[in-house]
């Protein structure tokens, strides 16, 4: 699949199973992610790979966030499901350095977001479906500690990666660009 087709047909797929990327494929995914736009060459992000037994640890961390934020019993069950939705989960932390005036925090956050998107595209290009998960639970104290976050850092994604149980339909809904583009 050429790059433009990949970009214009990418879709999330929440129904994932094994296999996940192997070590060589994962290395390529990270190489692609680290080519994200990055003013100041800061690489303001960190990736945490979870698979096998560490998915049980993720479940514990997500459940702790549900309790911490009093999100209720339904979210507690969702946390259990979420941690085991895919054979591999990659946590993404935006590592923000507020002391760099030349590259403000918002710009560092954008770079981390672009790296996450690059990670998704590289996985998709190698035949792996994925979905970017976020929400209040990524702000849980236990999860942030496990991911090595400093106060200024933000967990911006839990990217679930695996093989689609059902192939995500490549026909994406048509988006009229006129609603989003203005020419001066």
Curated annotation (Swiss-Prot):
| Keyword Ribosomal protein set for record | no
Q: How is the cofactor bound?
A: Binds 1 FMN per subunit.
Q: Does the keyword Secreted apply?
A: no
Needed cofactors: FMN
Q: Which NCBIfam families match?
A: PRK10828.1
Q: Which family does it belong to?
A: Belongs to the nitroreductase family.
Designated name of the protein: Putative NAD(P)H nitroreductase HI_1542
């Amino acid at each position: 699949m050429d790059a433009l087709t990949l970009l214009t047909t990418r879709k999330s797929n929440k129904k994932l199973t094994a296999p996940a990327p192997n070590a060589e494929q994962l290395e390529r995914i990270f190489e692609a992610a680290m080519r994200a736009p990055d003013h100041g060459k800061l690489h303001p992000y960190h990736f945490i790979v979870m698979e096998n037994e560490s998915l049980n640890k993720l479940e514990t961390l997500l459940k702790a966030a549900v309790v911490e934020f009093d999100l209720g019993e339904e979210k507690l069950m969702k946390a259990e499901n979420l941690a085991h939705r895919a054979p591999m989960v990659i946590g993404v932390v935006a590592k923000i350095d507020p002391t760099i005036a030349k590259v403000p925090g918002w710009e560092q956050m954008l770079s981390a977001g672009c790296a996450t998107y690059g990670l998704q595209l590289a996985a998709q290009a190698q035949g792996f479906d994925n979905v970017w998960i976020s929400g209040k639970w990524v702000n849980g104290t236990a999860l942030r500690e496990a991911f090595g976050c400093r106060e200024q850092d933000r967990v911006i994604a839990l990217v679930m990666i695996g093989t689609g149980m059902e192939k995500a339909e490549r026909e994406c809904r048509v988006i009229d660009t006129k609603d989003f583009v203005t020419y001066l």
